[in-house]
Amino acid sequence: MEKALSKTWSDRFDKGLNPFIEKFNASIEFDICLLEEDLDGSIAHARMLGIQGIITKEEALRLENGLQQIRKEASDGLFQPVIADEDVHFAVEKKLIDLIGPVGKKLHTGRSRNDQVGTDLRLWLRKRIDEIDMDLVRLQKSLFLLAEENLYTLIPGYTHLQRAQPLSLAHHLLAYIEMAQRDRNRLKDVRKRVNISPLGAAALAGTSISISRKITSSELHFQGIYSNSLDAVSDRDFVVEFLGASSLIMAHLSRLSEEVILWASEEFAFIQLTDRCATGSSLMPQKKNPDVPELVRGKSGRVFGHLQAMLTMIKGLPLAYNKDFQEDKEAIFDSVKTVKNSLIAISILFEEGLIFRKERLNQAVSSDFSNATDVADYLVAKDIPFREAYQLVGRIVKTSLEEGILLKDFPLERWKTFHKFFEKDIYEKLLPSSVVESRLSAGGTGFERVQEQLLSWREKLFN
């Protein structure tokens, strides 16, 4: 077999790679996603080499112009790397030498692919975090606008998937806005550790060439530099942290999706899916399927899997760089795509894909025993110990179930057989709207408290 002279590292070898191994080893098919970031990092590195006098300013300018030419060719669809290029870094370097000649060979001075790929991945992820943050804001706004319209719409609240207490629908939707805010805060925190430059750490031990890591860090708008070169090239904590934050985003979306799926079923019938976000059956003409939330619920497992894969990958790696790290790219690329698409899909679903069936919701909150706690509270207000009141109401509910009658339908005389303290005002307490309105503790579902939450979120999201 002929010697693989096309490889930058081939002079150490006498024979070329087995074709299958060459393809197995290559990452160009997916790390081409890092092209923009690789060019940005290389331009910053070239400028630094010129400033430091490691190459002449003219050479630095030629390198930068050549890299910008590659950017233009890529934009025009003319930059087409092949498997033999191995990865995006070698593909760029090879193309640069083709464009500007031997001076292109000076670009890699004082740099290794180990610190280069870490830099590229951080630059790429920094942008994607900012994009996901905006996608989360869109979801928050979609939920908020629906919540603002439904302050006085009531919906059953559940524990153990059993009806518990009625809620303001706005309160229910605001809970997911809170989750999304925590997701945003987590991403903001992860971004701080993404935004540290490894460039200049070289292969693992730094370099003897008089580079300036601070110059490249500033050029690329990093917050600072790694203080340990070994850690710089071997750190993938930021990938794990991002995948952890992404997993929680998907967990929240999956919970929301599950509720939409339940609400759309005939058994709940709380919402009607519009034609814009539902599909039909190839066999059963009556079906309208909640494919969007089902897909999001299913896709959550992909991101969870990538997190587990990354943790498993890094747990046994000795310092410093190992080829295993190549596996982080597809995990993070797919996770970003999955999270972004899922956020957009769920946002569209709440913007134009569902309608709450208010008559059905009203029927649901008026035909159960979710007001039982308020009967106990009624007695507590008359100085009966809560546990005693709780036990009494339990017996009342048992009687109601046995007789097939709701609490609101007991005549006053029957109420008094349970306890002498029951008066006519018990009926007002039993109304679902009264039950909700009375929950005035901070963060509660009482209309006043929810209105306060709505005003606060409008200020945060729209000002």
From Swiss-Prot:
Which superkingdom? Answer: Bacteria
Ordered alphabetically, the record's keywords are: Amino-acid biosynthesis, Arginine biosynthesis, Cytoplasm, Lyase
The disulfides recorded in the entry are: none
Q: Which GO terms describe its molecular function?
A: argininosuccinate lyase activity
Cellular component, GO annotation? cytosol
Q: What SUPFAM superfamilies does the record tag this protein with?
A: L-aspartase-like
State which Enzyme Commission number(s) the record gives: 4.3.2.1
**Which HAMAP family does this chain map to?**
Arg_succ_lyase (MF_00006)
PANTHER family listed in its UniProt record: ARGININOSUCCINATE LYASE (PTHR43814:SF1)
Q: Which NCBIfam families match?
A: argH (TIGR00838)
State the family it belongs to.
Belongs to the lyase 1 family. Argininosuccinate lyase subfamily.
Could you tell me what this protein is called?
Argininosuccinate lyase
**What organism, scientifically named, is this protein from?**
Prochlorococcus marinus (strain NATL1A)
- Gene symbol here is argH
